[in-house]
Curated annotation (Swiss-Prot):
Protein name: Purine nucleoside phosphorylase DeoD-type
InterPro entries xref list: DeoD-type, Nucleoside_phosphorylase_CS, Nucleoside_phosphorylase_d, Nucleoside_phosphorylase_sf
Record-listed a purine D-ribonucleoside binding positions: 5, 180-182, 204-205
Record family assignment: Belongs to the PNP/UDP phosphorylase family.
Feature type site, description Important for catalytic activity: 218
Keyword Glycosyltransferase attributed: yes
Top-level taxon of origin: Bacteria
Catalytic activity: a purine D-ribonucleoside + phosphate = a purine nucleobase + alpha-D-ribose 1-phosphate; a purine 2'-deoxy-D-ribonucleoside + phosphate = a purine nucleobase + 2-deoxy-alpha-D-ribose 1-phosphate; inosine + phosphate = alpha-D-ribose 1-phosphate + hypoxanthine; adenosine + phosphate = alpha-D-ribose 1-phosphate + adenine
pH and activity: Optimum pH is 7.1 for deoxyinosine as substrate. Optimum pH is 7.5 for inosine as substrate. Optimum pH is 8.2 for hypoxanthine as substrate.
UniProt keyword Acetylation, yes or no: yes
One GO MF term attached to the UniProt entry: purine-nucleoside phosphorylase activity
Modified residues (N6-acetyllysine): 27
UniProt-annotated binding residues for phosphate: 21, 25, 44, 88-91
Organism of this sequence: Escherichia coli (strain K12)
Gene: deoD
Amino acid sequence: MATPHINAEMGDFADVVLMPGDPLRAKYIAETFLEDAREVNNVRGMLGFTGTYKGRKISVMGHGMGIPSCSIYTKELITDFGVKKIIRVGSCGAVLPHVKLRDVVIGMGACTDSKVNRIRFKDHDFAAIADFDMVRNAVDAAKALGIDARVGNLFSADLFYSPDGEMFDVMEKYGILGVEMEAAGIYGVAAEFGAKALTICTVSDHIRTHEQTTAAERQTTFNDMIKIALESVLLGDKE
């Protein structure tokens, strides 16, 4: 049944949901990659759609910006609509010199300055990691598509406009591949409620060099990321 934030019914969502931050990107994914897509949510403009990809039922829905927003939507999808796997597909900023614009990053784990997972985990540190099989399937899908993908840790920041420039030095030292705002929260929700999750990001800007991708470049590499996510779902069905 419908929740305060999702006006769908049980069965409207597939067991796998791709989740970009922007609901308009969810609409783009549905219109570009899915067949027979239909809208299943529009509360607060957070659009959700369900269709098929190569015959496989898949849903896509926006999650908004930041851990509080994505935590609400992922929790409700899992506990109220029976979703088993969530794949966040979004953008990130790079800090390492060898990570370039348009690189695809598969988030094996996610560090964070958010306290949300500590609240969930009785004030202890929680290792926010992706599901291993989902990581492996994404890596295999990228290889099959001929797309280079980096695998490693993300950093999920609470502040987009952070005043702490020195923290980027620490991230570089620890080999953080990309900075975004949601992965650690999604991994925490999935762990708490017995689901599986993965984050795949495209590098849209470089925090050190201030380089940014153009709108056209973002769209091209965004499509690559979506192809990896969708093909990884099909590989997961073969397990």
